[in-house]
Structures are given as C-alpha cells and as structure tokens.
Amino acid sequence: MKGLRINMYYGDETKDLNSKLLIFIRMNISKKDLLRINQGFGGNLRSSSSLDFVFERIDTGKIGPYRKLAHLIRAILVDHPFSDGNKRTAMFVAFAFAKEYNKAIDRDLLLHHIISIASKNIQIIRNIEWRLKNAIK
C-alpha cells in the first residue's frame, strides 16, 4: 500500500487516505460514514433499504471481518444504493479495510473483482468473500 493515495473531496477540504483513515476500526463503519464517502465521489443515496439491512447484519459479532466486508461490498455493488460512485465507494471501503487490518492489496485483482461483482450481479456472499480474500491478503 506504499504510495497509494486516494483523495476524496469534502466541501472545501481534501482528505487523504494515507494521512487520515477515519472510518474503519474493526469494521466499525456507520451508514453516515458510507454516505459521506460516496458523496466524496459525487453520488447521492437513492435507496437506503439495502444499506439498512447490511448494517443490521454486520453489527452482529457472529461473522468475521471478511464476511462483513463481503456483505457491505455486495450491498454497494449489486443493489446500487447510490446514484453514482458505487464501484469507487466499494474500492475505497476495500482499501480502508486493508489499511485497518494491515493487509496487502493486489489492486488490479481487486479492481477486476469489483467490476466483475458489479457487472455479473454476483449475490453469493461466500463467492464475494472468496474474491476479497484473494485480492486482500
């Protein structure tokens, strides 16, 4: 992840992923955080039902971090809750996850998987989790 820079625009201020990662502490992300991330990519919320469901699901302590990430990525890429920036938001969430857990990312493979999940509407969580584990080690 050295040299990786993702800049997001928040009003008059640009925040950098490397200098300040504000949302992930052991998958402690809120819907409000996710909406703010997506707004940084120029999107707006279209439908909140899928996000409400996924946050209810990942708040239980019974599933592991990759499974939680898979649920969140699925909700973003398959259900398209935002008007724009769904894939960029999913990519940011994956980078933030890797940063929090000190994991290495195969960026090209992760991008391939994100595009594949979105274009093929892959809904099987186990399959999404496997893809994420492949790209984030």
Model-based region annotation:
Residues 1-137:
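FIC/Doc superfamily catalytic core
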